Amino acid sequence: MRNSIVYFCLLVCCITVRAEELKLWYSHPAEEWVEALPLGNSRLGAMIYGNPFEEEIQLNEETVWGGSPYRNDNPEAYGVLSEVRKLIFAGREITAEKLWKEHAFTKQNGMPYQTVGSLKLHFPGHEKYTDYYRDLNIENAVATVSYKVGDVTYIRTLFTSLADNALIIHLEADRPHSIAFEASYSTPFEESAVIASKNRLTLSAKASAHEEVPAAIRLESQARIKTSGGKVESDNGKLIVTEADVVTIYVSAATNFVNYQDVSANESKRVDVILNQVGKKSYRQLLDSHIGKYQQQFGRVKLDLGHSLASQKETPVRLKEFREGKDPALVTLMFQFGRYLLISSSQPGGQPANLQGIWNQHLLAPWDGKYTININTEMNYWPAEITNLPETHEPLFRLVNELAETGKKTAQTMYHCNGWVAHHNTCLLYTSPSPRDR
């Protein structure tokens, strides 16, 4: 009997450890962007800060890029090509590089990947809280935030549905009529507007011009609120929810981008189509369909490197203590987190993962968040085949096929060659894969 009790306790401990291993979890809200929890379904990205008082959900849509379709082939390149070769063979690489830049480069270095902005949820009276917890469960691609204000427990559940193409935010409390908040949009774009009407909040904007290339991408994001109990009112660009029992917020975004030659779509109609369909389903249906579709890909690979009690510690502590070598399960977590990020940023029919994956808070991201095809794009996709995620490769292969078309003119114009060429970088509006300085 005594041995049975010991065995049972060890079994429970093992189960507890295993349950925590594929979660990133924290005992405090994110204080900066890199600490927020990333959600994504390839088309939409969201960074969840998890602040009880002022929740910020930074949003991305994969086709929000500055500038417009363009070419920057430079016909002067061919005229100096022979001299550049001679200089290189003579060991004068710096002189060759200078000559090449003067005659092959143009003012355009590619267009930048840009943020949509943020959806903000302001919860009056939630400045002081206890029992805080937030996590990202990478087995089901769902983020959770929970905390107490007084003796009321609040839970937020968030996911970007792979099945229904929307961000779902579900708010609960263990006391009736306890949910009250204001919802608003913010965006860094100068040309933008926010309209609140009934239960719908709409952000419309135009991406920015870049390097003398005018802006062409228009975007729209909508948040629609559905409550159980309470009421929803609109006021001065905000939606105000009071005395609700349960709230579900449906969020999506779209642009006018069709392909690298065509930006004629209606972004507003696209969002309406998505959210009209989402609104026909219950929260449970949305959650179940999302998890089911995600696990079809994620669940193909298991990795077990061993377990330890370190798995019960929050993620920042595990990372700090990892050098002690007593947390093999953290390696498993990081391996599976890499697969999670690729699933979340690259799906068939969408765009490839860029330098930011799909998550970016800037108008000018580091290196513009482009597809740096001399190594970084390849590195993004190293896990695709060897970790059994072959469908994530489809956007990359489509990019290569389109570069093969646009690169024909580059090869002819700059090198007087047949075939096609691409240099070390490209972007969504990649009608010209010409040389760039970054």
Question: Residues of each region from the PLM?
Answer:
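Bacterial Sec-dependent N-terminal signal peptides
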Residues: 1-20
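Low-complexity, intrinsically disordered/propeptide-like segments
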Residues: 11-14, 312, 431
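Aromatic-residue-lined binding/catalytic grooves and analogous aromatic/hydrophobic interfacial grooves
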Residues: 20-429
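Conserved small/polar residues in nucleotide/adenosyl-binding loops
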Residues: 430-437
